C-alpha cells in the first residue's frame, strides 16, 4: 500500500512539469496525457514521447535563437536547463542516434514561485557545438532538457534543417517570440545564495565549497554518535 502511494505521488510530480519551445519551433504538443502516457509525456527521453516530425524548422548553420516557456505547470520555482544537439538521420526513428552535443553551458532558471506562471526565456544566439561545421540541408534536432525541482527530467525537441545565415526561410526573431520575462532569473548551475551571519546581504559561494565544509563536519558528527552508543 505504501509503495503504491509513493508511486502515485511520484507520478503526480512527473505530470506537473512541462516546457514549451516557442522558437525556432517545436516537435509537437506533448503537454497532454493519454493511455500510453497516463502521467504525461515530457518525462520520456529523448523528446518527450514524440517521434521525429517531417515538419522541420530552418535554422542557420552558424547558430541562432532558442526561446522557451518553463513554467506551464507547477514545480518550476527553480530548474536546471540543458540544451543539446543530436545530429543526422541514423537513429531508430530517422532522427539522431543520441543527443550528445551540448550547445550551451547548463544553467539554472529562477521562477516567481512553484505554481504555474507565464513567462518566456530567450537565448538570442546559441552557437552550434564546438568542432562541428554544418552545410545547407544537414538535419539535426535541438533537445531542451529541464531538470525540475522535484528531480524529474523533462524533454522537448525541435527538428531543424540547417540553411545559410540570412536565408529568408529562417523565421524572424522578434520581441514577440524571443524575449526574457521580468519575473524570470538565471544563475550559474553550481552557485547558491547564502545569507552571511550578522550581515544583511547575500553572498555567492560555490556548491563545491559548501560540500567541502560539510565534509569537515562528518568526523565530528560520527564521533558524537559513537559516544552515544
Swiss-Prot record:
The organism's place on the tree of life at top rank: Eukaryota
Disruption phenotype: Leads to alteration in cell fusion between conidial anastomosis tubes. Displays reduced basal MAK-1 activity.
GO molecular function, one term: metal ion binding
Glycan-modified residues: 55, 98, 139, 174, 180
Propeptide part(s) removed at maturation, as residue ranges: 207-229
Cofactor: Cu(2+)
Cofactor comment text: Binds 1 copper ion per subunit.
A Pfam family per the record: BIM1-like_dom
Keywords: Cell membrane, Copper, Disulfide bond, Glycoprotein, GPI-anchor, Lipoprotein, Membrane, Metal-binding, Signal
Designated name of the protein: Lytic polysaccharide monooxygenase-like protein ham-7
Lineage: Eukaryota, Fungi, Dikarya, Ascomycota, Pezizomycotina
Amino acid at each position: 500500500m505504501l509503495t503504491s502511494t509513493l508511486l502515485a505521488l511520484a507520478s503526480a510530480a512527473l505530470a506537473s512539469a512541462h516546457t514549451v519551445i516557442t522558437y525556432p519551433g517545436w516537435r509537437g504538443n506533448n503537454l497532454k496525457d493519454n493511455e500510453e502516457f497516463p502521467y504525461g509525456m515530457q518525462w520520456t527521453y529523448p523528446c518527450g514521447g514524440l517521434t521525429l516530425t517531417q515538419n522541420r524548422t530552418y535554422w542557420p548553420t552558424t547558430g541562432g535563437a532558442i526561446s522557451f516557456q518553463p513554467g506551464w505547470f507547477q514545480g518550476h520555482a527553480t530548474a536546471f536547463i540543458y540544451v543539446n544537439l543530436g545530429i543526422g538521420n541514423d537513429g531508430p526513428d530517422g532522427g539522431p542516434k543520441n543527443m550528445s552535443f551540448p550547445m550551451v553551458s547548463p544553467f539554472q532558471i529562477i521562477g516567481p514561485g512553484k505554481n504555474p506562471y507565464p513567462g518566456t526565456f530567450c537565448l538570442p544566439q546559441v552557437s552550434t557545438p564546438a568542432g562541428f561545421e554544418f552545410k545547407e540541408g544537414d538535419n539535426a534536432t535541438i533537445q531542451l532538457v529541464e531538470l525540475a525541482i522535484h528531480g524529474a527530467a523533462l524533454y522537448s525537441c525541435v527538428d531543424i534543417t540547417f540553411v545559410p545565415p540570412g536565408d529568408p526561410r529562417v523565421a524572424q526573431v522578434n520581441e514577440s517570440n524571443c524575449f526574457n520575462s521580468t519575473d524570470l532569473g538565471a544563475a550559474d548551475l553550481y552557485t547558491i545564495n547564502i545569507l552571511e551571519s550578522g550581515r544583511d546581504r547575500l553572498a555567492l559561494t560555490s556548491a563545491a565549497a559548501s560540500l567541502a565544509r560539510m565534509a569537515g563536519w562528518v568526523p565530528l558528527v560520527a564521533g558524537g554518535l559513537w559516544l552515544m552508543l
